Amino acid sequence: MNNIWWQTKGQGNVHLVLLHGWGLNAEVWRCIDEELSSHFTLHLVDLPGFGRSRGFGALSLADMAEAVLQQAPDKAIWLGWSLGGLVASQIALTHPERVQALVTVASSPCFSARDEWPGIKPDVLAGFQQQLSDDFQRTVERFLALQTMGTETARQDARALKKTVLALPMPEVDVLNGGLEILKTVDLRQPLQNVSMPFLRLYGYLDGLVPRKVVPMLDKLWPHSESYIFAKAAHAPFISHPVEFCHLLVALKQRV
């Protein structure tokens, strides 16, 4: 069994596991990890095949969730950003007793656009998969630029994301393709109607990957969940609005 890279920081009485997005690694949380580790016992994770978690091929969402759970605390708040939001959601569905609260950040239960469902056009995701085999570093950089577009700090936010990617060896092409396949095919809209733990959904108003139109649709589908939109953020609100972001998580801690 390959080990997942896992770092624990802080002494808080509540555990908080942070799961990053596609193409990235746990270094993406460095802008908020000091602040959060003063409130939580913080767990920083490189998803299987990403960052320092080497030796994994492309995994299904279920296998990725199970691999992460092997090293996780017995009970924690699980926070997932983008693709990581699907992994955290899968864990909440299959092991609810391990999840004190679920937090998804700039994530969708169904990233791919479907009938009457806003999302990323399937041909865009397929295009990324095609381009990965041609020039995968450039493809990943394009994807990162998409994530910060439109914000006041877009250029520096994109630089921060790029630095995170370049800090560690690039994931294998099949791992990146496997992640895109999850984004293209997974649909957790109906299953997540049944989760009963506190469920907080955070969005960026300017997000080009998770359209804000999904927010009221999910408010209606999941009335037990809460949503919050960062008015001037895009796909990475914890980078553009770190203080506000941490404040919301500390407030959630008081309620679980």
Curated annotation (Swiss-Prot):
Q: Sorted alphabetically, which keywords does the UniProt record give?
A: Biotin biosynthesis, Cytoplasm, Hydrolase, Serine esterase
The record places the active site at S82, D207, H235
Where can this protein be found?
Answer: Cytoplasm
Where the protein is mainly located, per its record? cytoplasm
Q: Tell me which InterPro entries the record gives.
A: AB_hydrolase_1 (IPR000073), AB_hydrolase_fold (IPR029058), BioH (IPR010076), Carboxylesterase_BioH (IPR050228)
What EC identifiers does the entry list?
A: 3.1.1.85
Reactions listed under catalytic activity: 6-carboxyhexanoyl-[ACP] methyl ester + H2O = 6-carboxyhexanoyl-[ACP] + methanol + H(+)
**What do the Gene Ontology cellular component annotations say?**
cytoplasm
Residues annotated as binding substrate are W22, S82, L83, F143, L144, A145, L146, Q147, H235
Per the record, the GO terms for biological process are: biotin biosynthetic process
Query: Which PANTHER family does the UniProt entry name for this protein?
Result: HYDROLASE ALPHA/BETA FOLD FAMILY, PIMELOYL-[ACYL-CARRIER PROTEIN] METHYL ESTER ESTERASE
Assembly notes: Monomer.
What's the protein here called? Pimeloyl-[acyl-carrier protein] methyl ester esterase
Q: Which organism is it from?
A: Escherichia coli O9:H4 (strain HS)
Its ancestry begins with: Bacteria, Pseudomonadati, Pseudomonadota, Gammaproteobacteria, Enterobacterales
Name of the gene: bioH
